[in-house]
């Protein structure tokens, strides 16, 4: 086992992890940045709509929209922090330093879009590939920064804590403290130890524990599961947001249909052309996501139809092709001309409003363990997230966590012990069993812990998942670790955490909707 020592270990190289790495490097810190895949394989890369850049004289209106979308449950301190600090975070990194190619009008001013739940236009964008444009620029800057070492194909296995993984016997009595992680190099199959003064979880969300998801493969709540195993507090995990509009066609892949379409005039209709959202919410098709997703679910249950539709007829064809080229091209690949035809859509798991509980500087209850981005939960989103807040949250949480970590490290007082050697098993896990277990897990979560839940459904889900966890733990104890086995182990733990949180909360709020009966 090789041991690598650094100032900061960042697990996840999406926007939050990469922005943290850049901010930490500017303070003279050495950073190890781990990612499952290459630099652009992250949920941030798939964000289509945009990022909030609110320079209005009335920022309190944005705060109002965030709280309203959350059904009145958002943490006021977290909301105020994002509204106050968000514009500077965007200006400093994305506009001044990286000059990201956001869309501009004929005068050179940033174009502003509107999405569901927003009372005004305040979202900047790069066509319908905003996340890709941002992450591409950020990743290039990361790769040009000597203080940052990118480790693609390195997967965190478990966090290191003094009481469990130090080779110093006296550390078993130490306060709960993280000092890095065991990490699998998937290219060699070897497990190494990365020892760090600060460990930052930026591993994204958990959407792939559900059968239908907008998330990248591997988004199974890695950071949430690992932090739970070392005693970190998790909160609000019952609040899983389902995006209302994901492309649906038999034998075609599911992909996100950006909410910005509805901001520009697209409306949801059923197979008869009826605008069913108009009778449900004053904003109609621009209602908050939880309301729209649930309305679609109920519409489909009542009609027996497989999908609803987005009607884009309010937009001119040239505007659609110019503003939404990615959506137009991907739909065309599957036989839908969005300038003339309705887009068939269904909801899918999209974003975890809950996560590892942190303060506004990313600190968890485990010393020297931080969490940022979607992995973390400050209470910003409460029971439901407002559209286009996710990328902004990534930037602000990364910035302030890195600044706090820089100050802590400069103050000194860190002791990094030698970790215990990793004990590798020899037997290979059966890949067929792993695939089947993951499929069962995802189907269970979709059917029993999805958009609408009941106590009996959740009880059934918990029973199935507990049996699965026993089998998976046996794999993990007896077999050599692989990426697939790590993902399965973390997926079942995260799924159980979501089901447990949902079972404890009988109150329907936002994304968590409880019904009586089977």
Model-derived segments and spans:
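Core beta-strand elements of the Rossmann-like FAD/NAD(P) dinucleotide-binding domain
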Residues: 3-6, 189-198, 365-368
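Glycine- and aromatic-enriched mobile tails/lids
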Residues: 4, 23, 27, 38-40, ...
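N-terminal Rossmann-like FAD-binding beta1-loop-alpha1 element of flavoenzymes
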Residues: 8-33
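Conserved N-terminal glycine-rich FAD pyrophosphate-binding loop of Rossmann-like flavoproteins
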Residues: 37-67, 71, 241-244, 252-255
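Short beta-strand to alpha-helix junction loop
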Residues: 76-87, 122-140, 151, 213-221, ...
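Conserved redox-cofactor binding core of oxidoreductases
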Residues: 94-190, 195, 202, 246-249, ...
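Glycine-rich loop(s) and the adjacent beta-strand/alpha-helix scaffold that form part
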Residues: 198-255, 302, 388-400
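An anion/pyrophosphate-binding glycine-rich loop and adjacent beta-alpha core
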Residues: 226, 232-341, 404-410
């Amino acid at each position: 086992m090789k041991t690598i020592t650094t100032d900061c270990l960042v697990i996840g190289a999406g926007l939050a992890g990469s922005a943290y790495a850049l901010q930490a490097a500017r303070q003279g810190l050495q950073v190890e940045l781990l990612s499952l895949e290459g630099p652009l394989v992250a949920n941030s890369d798939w964000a289509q709509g945009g990022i909030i850049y609110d320079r209005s004289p009335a920022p309190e209106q944005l705060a109002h929209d965030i709280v309203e979308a959350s059904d009145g449950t958002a943490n006021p301190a977290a909301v105020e922090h994002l509204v106050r600090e968000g514009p500077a975070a965007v200006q400093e990194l994305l506009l001044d330093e990286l000059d990201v190619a956001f869309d501009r009008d004929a005068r050179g001013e940033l174009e502003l879009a509107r999405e569901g739940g927003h009372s005004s236009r305040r979202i900047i964008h790069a066509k319908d590939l905003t996340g890709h444009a941002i992450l591409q620029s950020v990743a290039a800057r990361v790769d040009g920064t000597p203080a940052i070492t990118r480790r693609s194909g390195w997967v965190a296995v478990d966090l290191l804590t003094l009481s469990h993984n130090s080779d110093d016997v006296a550390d078993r009595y130490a306060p709960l403290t993280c000092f890095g992680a065991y990490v699998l190099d998937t290219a060699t199959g070897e497990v190494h130890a990365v020892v760090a003064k600060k460990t930052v979880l930026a591993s994204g969300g958990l959407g792939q524990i559900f059968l239908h998801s907008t998330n990248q493969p591997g988004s199974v709540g890695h950071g949430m599961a690992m932090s739970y195993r070392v005693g970190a507090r998790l909160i609000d995990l019952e609040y899983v947001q389902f995006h209302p509009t994901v492309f649906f066609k038999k034998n075609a892949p599911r992909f996100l249909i950006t909410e910005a379409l509805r901001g520009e005039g697209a409306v949801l209709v059923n197979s008869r052309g009826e605008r069913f959202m108009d009778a449900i919410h004053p904003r109609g098709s621009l209602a908050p996501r939880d309301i729209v997703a649930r309305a679609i679910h109920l519409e489909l249950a009542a009609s027996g139809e497989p999908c609803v539709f987005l009607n884009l007829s309010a937009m001119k064809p040239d505007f659609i092709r110019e503003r939404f080229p990615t959506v137009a091209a991907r739909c065309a690949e599957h036989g839908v001309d969005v300038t003339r035809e309705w887009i068939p859509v269904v909801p899918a798991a999209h974003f975890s409003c809950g996560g590892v509980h942190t303060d506004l500087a990313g600190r968890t209850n485990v010393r020297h363990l931080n969490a940022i981005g979607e992995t973390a939960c400050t209470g910003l989103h409460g029971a439901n997230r407002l559209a286009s807040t996710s990328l902004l949250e990534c930037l602000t949480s990364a910035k302030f966590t890195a600044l706090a970590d820089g100050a802590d490290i400069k103050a000194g007082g860190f002791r990094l012990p030698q970790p215990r050697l990793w004990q590798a098993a020899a037997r290979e896990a059966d890949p067929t069993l792993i695939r089947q277990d993951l499929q069962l897990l995802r189907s269970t979560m979709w059917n029993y812990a999805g958009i609408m839940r009941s106590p009996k459904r959740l009880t059934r889900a918990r029973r199935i998942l507990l049996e699965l966890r026993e089998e998976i733990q046996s794999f993990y104890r007896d077999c050599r670790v692989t990426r697939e086995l790590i993902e399965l182990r973390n997926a079942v733990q995260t799924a159980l955490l979501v089901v447990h949180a949902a079972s404890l909360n009988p109150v329907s709020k936002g994304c968590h909707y409880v019904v009586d009966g089977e």
